[in-house]
Amino acid sequence: MISTTSTRSQMEATPYEVAQAALIKWGAFMLSIYVIYLLVFPLTPTIYREDHVLEIEQMLRHGRKEFAKFYVLGLFGLFYAYWRVLRTVHSLSREDPEAAKSLRVWVLGVGILCAITLIGLYPITALDVVLYVVRARLWALYDASPMLAWPANYPQDPYIRFAGEYIKEPSPYGPLWELIAQIPIRLGILDIAGGVIAMKVITLISYIAMAVLIGWYARQETSRYRVSGLTAMTFFALNPLVLIQAIGNGHNDMVMLALITLGLVLWQRDRWAAAAFAITLAALIKISGLILMPLFGVAMLAAAPDWRTRILRGLGMASIFIFTAAAAYRVTGPFPEVFLGAQHALFDRWGYTPAYATLVVAEEIFQYEGAVKEVIANAAHLLFILYYVYLLIRVAQRKLTLIQAGFFAYLSQLLLGTTFRIWYPLWLIPFAALELNSRTYWRTFLFSITAELSILMYLIVWRWKLDTWDWGLNGPLKPYWHYWTVMTLTTAPWVFGIPLLGPLLLKWKNSRKFNTSLWL
């Protein structure tokens, strides 16, 4: 009798109830993994135990190596649960669009619960958030602009030791971020753990704002894929890369991306001046936000009905950008010195990209000398510029929308840049969420997985296995068995190859389905 009743209730469940139950089940699964991560890697007291910041490998090497397996399995579990939820909500959106709207609050609630849990997580795979606090203290306590000052110049500060390898570098971030970051310090949050939590709260607020913008206010650029606000918001809000990197590691990219999303939503509503202001603010958080500005300018001019309107809007946008940027940078220091940190970050850092892999092959294997580094860097930059000009032309011709061109621009920056960090694929998400199709979904999804797992390769796999592997040390690859050579030539193909080739294989398998729907 009980079995019959249960079967009947399942048969009578509405699509909304089925989707809600799946969300609760998989949401609880995701939350449980984040809670376990929190228990193993708590922010406090971990941050007080050492005189420097710790990487995940350093936290596991003594007596806890077995947990590395669980960490990896946990990541796969998180991405699997995320994929299951995304499929469920997309199915509901197609079957009952009105009911799907009611599930947005539930999805956002699950995301916020996971995010709040991760506020207490030690930043295990990226330590930038600790640097935010150190640099904010320079300004708030010592009246030294982090855009100019080195942490090394203030040895009296008890937390300067956390600056690590960046102790003799000015801030690479924009002035707006440095203005925001010092607010918690000026409010009296002087402890290092409290400062880290405050920075994560800032990213949490940005995360919620971006989720609301995507779920309630944005619209899809192309209607034929039948993607709802619920699906788009789920794509963003439950992505493990977003939650771990933006909240768990507290990256200020989240603030930049929320402002970019605001700018795109305003653009969709023909509020070009407000959109220009929001995108300018995004570029003043991180210089990478600047990539969108020329595309926005061309899209705005192309959409204007006549030349008089184009001239007026062009002058208006230029005024908004120039005066806002000049005012923000002027507060942080004199020109051009305030740009030194960003310049160093853009042009002097290398690592784990196709360009850097090319450099490693040239220098380590073929023993090229001289200006090979400059040649490769210039070639990569030139390729990006040429492709970017192509995108500008396509936008001017109205063959690409701003959102489509933005996705391609940031994707090309990931591929052609000279440096890569595991949270950089976050840059794709605002554009993918507002133009969600098989191509943008799979590129972003696969990039999220390969990036999140890549740090384990060059921290754990190398240090625990490959560094002491007898075949590598004494075999035919002995002359090349060095950290940068081995890790770059294994990590770069993994991180970039899978997101590039994966969608092509799906398209080859079923081109019609790939091109006409969101194939999950």
Regions found by a protein language model. Name each.
Residues 67-72, 175, 179, 189-209, ...:
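Loop-to-helix entry region of an early transmembrane alpha helix in multi-pass inner-membrane enzymes
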Residues 99-200, 204:
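Intramembrane catalytic core of multi-pass membrane enzymes that act on lipidic substrates
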Residues 101-107, 214-239:
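Transmembrane-helix signature of polytopic, membrane-embedded enzymes
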Residues 111, 232-237, 279, 283:
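Short helix- or helix-capping micro-motifs
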Residues 209-213, 244, 255-271, 410:
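Specific aromatic-rich, kink-prone transmembrane helix
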Residues 226, 230, 261, 266-281, ...:
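Short hydrophobic alpha-helices at membrane interfaces in multi-pass membrane enzymes
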